[in-house]
């Protein structure tokens, strides 16, 4: 009888161990396979490639969530051009903030011949989406210089955050004004949710626009 119990325990243990690699993790688990920290790496490539250029040309795409076939066609179209220095994705890579959605879009965008950077969209903030976005792509507010143009990329998805978080982050905007590169003569403010959109906190729209216009004075 004791032997039978022992055999049962051992058999169960062996079954459990052999079945471990078949465990399916929760869609919002946040375990990431593949490349991470993409924006930082690609920004370094962009700044190096564009350093001596007076003019930069970049592709802008957005809201590719759930459309992998369309994203693949966009990638193919951009790759067919020789005059695009980099691609700027304005967010909504995911529909529901699922880890797999970000991985699928990343893997598709990785086929671009030239560097790309991604901003966070309102759908990307759902569930554990913000965490996954930060791991795969990087900070939700960031800036870089391509040639003589400064790109200030902002999280403006106010409705996805509570009032303990400043969205847009005016501290970041002020900091960027203070460290504005001397060589930059142009500014591109990139965001997913523009002022007047339903995702933007329109109570602060006038102040936000005023702060963005301050970049023009810095560049003048």
Question: Where in the sequence are the language-model features?
Answer:
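Sec-dependent bacterial lipoprotein signal peptides
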Residues: 1-18
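N-terminal active-site segment of His-dependent metallophosphoesterases
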Residues: 20-104
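Beta-strand-turn-beta hairpins that frame and shape the catalytic cleft
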Residues: 49-58, 143-153, 180-182, 186
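Hydrophobic/aromatic beta-strand patches that form the interior of the parallel beta-sheet core
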Residues: 59, 88, 117-119, 152, ...
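Active-site metal-binding loops of divalent metal-dependent hydrolases
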Residues: 62-65, 91-93, 122-123, 156-157, ...
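Core catalytic region of metal-dependent phosphoesterases/phosphodiesterases
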Residues: 70-141, 145-146, 215-218
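His/acidic metal-ligating clusters that form di-metal
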Residues: 79-86, 161-220
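Extracytoplasmic/secreted cell-surface and envelope-processing proteins
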Residues: 96-100, 126-130, 153, 162, ...
């Amino acid at each position: 009888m004791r032997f039978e119990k022992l055999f049962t325990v051992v058999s169960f243990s062996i079954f459990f161990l052999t079945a471990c690699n078949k465990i399916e993790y929760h869609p919002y688990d946040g375990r990431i396979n593949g490349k991470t920290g993409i924006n930082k790496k690609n920004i370094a490539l962009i700044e190096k490639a564009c350093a001596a250029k007076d003019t930069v040309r970049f592709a802008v795409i957005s809201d590719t969530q759930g459309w992998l076939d369309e994203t693949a066609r966009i990638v193919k179209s951009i790759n067919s051009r020789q005059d695009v220095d980099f691609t700027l994705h304005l967010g909504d890579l995911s529909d529901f903030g699922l880890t797999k959605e970000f991985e699928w879009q990343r893997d598709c965008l990785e086929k671009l011949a030239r560097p790309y950077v991604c901003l966070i969209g309102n759908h990307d903030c759902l569930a554990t989406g913000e965490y996954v976005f930060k791991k795969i792509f990087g900070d939700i507010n960031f800036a870089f210089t391509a040639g003589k143009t400064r790109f200030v990329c902002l999280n403006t998805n106010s409705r996805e955050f509570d009032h303990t978080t400043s969205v847009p982050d005016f501290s970041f905007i002020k900091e960027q004004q203070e460290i504005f590169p001397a060589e930059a003569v142009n500014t591109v403010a990139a965001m997913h949710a523009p002022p007047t959109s339903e995702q933007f906190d329109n109570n602060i729209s006038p102040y936000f626009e005023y702060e963005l216009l301050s970049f023009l004075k810095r560049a003048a």
